[in-house]
Amino acid sequence: MADGTYRFQQPGAGQFFFQTQPQQHSHQRHIARNGTNSPTGRLKFNHDTPSPSRSPPLSQAAALNPFNMYSQTHQGQHVMMNGGQAHQRFGMQIPKFQSQSHHPHHTQQPHHHTHHNQASHNINHQHNFSSGALASATPHFTPSHIQNGAHTNVDEDIDESMNEHWQQQLQLAAESRQASSPHYHARSVAQQAKGIQIAPSQPETQEQVPDGQNGVVKAKASSRQGWHALDFGGQGLRALSTSLFNYVFLEKLYLNHNKLKALPPTIGQLRKLNHLDLSGNDLTELPEEIGMLTNLKKLYLFDNNIRTLPYEMGYLYRLETLGVEGNPLNDVLKSHIMKEGTKALIKYLKEEMPVHLPPPDRDWIVLDETASSSNHRTDKVTVLSYNTLCDSSATQSHYGYAPARVLSWEFRRELILNELRSHDSDIICLQEIDQGSYNEYFREQLAYNDYKGVYWPRGRAMGMQEEDAKCVDGCATFFKASKFILLDKQLINFGQTAVRRPDAKGQDDIYNRLWQKDHIAVVVFLENRQTGSRFIVVNAHLYWDPAFKDVKLIQTAILMEELTKLSETYAKWPPCTDKAAFRFSKEEGQSETPPLEEPAPSMQYASGDQIPLLMCGDLNSSPGSAAYNLIAHGRLDEEHPDLEKRLYGNLSKVGMTHPFKLKSAYGAIGELPFTNYTPDFKDILDYIWYSSNSLHVSALLGEVDKDYLQRVPGFPNYHFPSDHIALLAEFTVKGKKGKVVEADFGPQRN
């Protein structure tokens, strides 16, 4: 310890390694700059060390004595010796932000750079701060300059703002300014994996010390692993390649301490990011697409030139830390984050977000132009299926990215009603409609549009008080009263139906897993007043949890089994005699209405599978799943993996079959990209199935505009009232095939 202030300049044993890329912070001595009083030679000790309990005066700042080993915040570890840190024999690794009280030469005084006046030095001038220095220096530590060259006075700004939220800002900003060296974060992770704590400007090691020497463990060769982080920090980048944003698996991206002036909108493609560091650049704004990064927990924007933030950042409902120190942020935004923290600012942006322009209308895709252009009367039917997201499920805990107004049922139900009226389909199948909404709103409102409805709530509503039962959701099926006659309606409760099966005795899984789920299907049997065609319309909602694939499969099997029984009953249903639709009496002066065509007689069907079948609903099963394959292929083996060897009577012993030839309506275009759209889940869950032997799909409602989706991370929002989208299909009833009779022209001459 006798060598004092010259100690860190003495050559040590082993080889020295220096940064190959010149950096202003990697010097062995301080270089005099214009307007500074930095020393040009060796200085003696400054014994007038200020108390750690107060900020030191600028004239006695530790920066004026760069060789003072007693300043904890200015250690001279700029050299690696023998592949290790130059100070490794004296220092010990300690937890972050804990004072190193066992180091007698650490005075724990803050480090004010009063001798730097250029804006660029805020980024490029970098010294080593030990972990204990930062904690002990706070709350006194604040850089005396920011990127735009304007000085800040700590005492003026932090009197009221020095709460826990702003303290965290200052601490993280200080850490960020230490991380200006190239690939700092990547090197830190690599060194920590080897058991070494790296200094900010530590050069990369080129040698490994032997096993066990100086407590350093030699890295073991390991197989290649997947990576999820990318560090481009300190590279002087001025632009980013578009290829970068194809790495959609990235979870951490460091672009700090570069020269970026703009962030490309394609940043929105990296939707798995949870950590994004853009500190120390020249950014003046952020793109709207930043709101697509809903998994972000840390977003560092320290030391840029950002004055305002896009409202789309309100979508970042998981964001825990937003670093904005060192930006000329406007007073309103800065006040929110200084006083209440990141969560309050994000909530403010979310609730104040303006309503954007709606997307273009979804295309109407015509698959059979002959059916649309035909002049003769054709037997057509349009069917809409829609999971409306019931009021009790639309909570901030589930949909934190949606403003409070968007989640309010009064707002959403009006959007739903307007959408139903605009499509004006013959049949509507709604899932997740509670009893109160059906009885008090939709049934009344849709009656003005010639609809009649059939509704059943889920099983839990039985035994409840009337007021409580109103909040239980169920399935509602509406049909045009002027076009169809309701012949029959049935409820299928999957759990109750399963326990009534003769083979359910002794099957524990039926009671423990299936019976507890109260999901249902509503079946209506309709007849077209004019053509006499009959339809079985199914409206189903299956269990959602992916961990219960066996339950969804058995629910589907029970549904198809019950439909098989019902279809055979409906095949023997007697003809309908009174088919005239109700008509209001004519008022005086009202013009004569044209007479209706004479209704055709009721169609007769030889078997249940000949009746046109339309099966709609939220099956919570994606294409290729066991439930999907059972419906599409008509059978499923008893040993299917989704059953997980659980016991469900004959369904798991014999297998599952059904006689219907069903196809997905949207299978004609390869299915939609999604029917359920949230930040964490985007998949196909909703379907309109039809019996291909009796129906032909002629038109479909297309997908949501792709450009619109580039700025919207999930539904519901101001234009889509549910996390699901509506499905709409048009079908043409196939004519019955009669017996082919060959004409007899008599004997023919050769």
Swiss-Prot record:
Lipid biosynthesis found in the keyword field: no
GO CC annotation, single: Cdc73/Paf1 complex
Positions with biased composition (Polar residues): 48-58
Disordered: region residues: 31-60, 98-124, 175-194
SUPFAM superfamilies for the chain: DNase I-like (SSF56219), L domain-like (SSF52058)
Binding annotation for Mg(2+): E432
One GO molecular-function entry: RNA binding
PROSITE patterns with a match to the protein in the record: LRR
Basic residues bias spans: 102-118
Reaction equations catalysed: Exonucleolytic cleavage of poly(A) to 5'-AMP
InterPro entries given in the database record: CCR4/nocturin_mRNA_transcr, Endo/exonu/phosph_ase_sf, Endo/exonuclease/phosphatase, Leu-rich_rpt, Leu-rich_rpt_typical-subtyp, LRR_dom_sf
Subcellular location: Cytoplasm; Nucleus
Record keyword Glycosyltransferase present: no
Principal subcellular localisation of the protein: cytoplasm
One GO-annotated biological process of the protein: positive regulation of transcription elongation by RNA polymerase II
Known cofactor(s): Mg(2+)
EC number: 3.1.13.4
Intervals holding LRR repeats: 249-270, 272-293, 295-316, 318-339
Keywords assigned: Cytoplasm, Exonuclease, Hydrolase, Leucine-rich repeat, Magnesium, Metal-binding, Nuclease, Nucleus, Repeat, RNA-binding, Transcription, Transcription regulation
Functional note: Acts as a catalytic component of the CCR4-NOT core complex, which in the nucleus seems to be a general transcription factor, and in the cytoplasm the major mRNA deadenylase involved in mRNA turnover. Ccr4 has 3'-5' RNase activity with a strong preference for polyadenylated substrates and also low exonuclease activity towards single-stranded DNA.
Family classification: Belongs to the CCR4/nocturin family.
PANTHER family documented for this protein: CARBON CATABOLITE REPRESSOR PROTEIN 4, POLY(A)-SPECIFIC RIBONUCLEASE
The protein's name in its UniProt record: CCR4-Not complex 3'-5'-exoribonuclease subunit Ccr4
Source organism of the structure: Neosartorya fischeri (strain ATCC 1020 / DSM 3700 / CBS 544.65 / FGSC A1164 / JCM 1740 / NRRL 181 / WB 181) (Aspergillus fischerianus)
Gene name linked to the record: ccr4
